[in-house]
Amino acid sequence: MRAGTTITWEDFLASGEDGQRWEWVDGEVEFMSPVNLRHENFLVLLIACLAQFCRAHPEWMAFASNGVFTMASGNWRMPDASLVRSVRFPEKKIPVRADFAPDVAFEILSPSDSPSQIQRKRLDYQQSEVIQVWFDLEKRLVEVIYPDRPLQYYREDDTLTIDAVPGLSIDLKDLFSI
């Protein structure tokens, strides 16, 4: 399909196969390569941290990698993990996909990610005013991109905090211990 092509939700779901992840980007279905076990284990540990945070802070909800969000561009993105303020789901009714971007998107860099794919995803998040948290497993580095201020970097000995998410505190040494 060409850029600007429209697609129904049902067509989007039928585009891939079970166990495969894909996103709708610039009018085309973009398939995502399977992740390695290290990536997957890191994601499980991250989701556990986010779930623990949400239990203590019910004003937030955490989603794993198959949650689909609509960016300002119209693209459908599936961050590795995300946080969304609960008030964005009236009466806590969670739809099949969100017609909005998450408040915070967590992404784990993969060797198969091309620089252009990463840049396009960052731009989508930026235009949608999403706080982005990018994990580089090789460099053991975390990059936090806010829509309205300079980048922040965290190393594996640091504790990740996000001003807009009071109470969130992730010990990166525990995450990077894999």
Predicted regions and their residues:
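Gly/Pro/Ser/Thr-rich low-complexity, intrinsically disordered segments predominantly at protein N-termini
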Residues: M1-I178
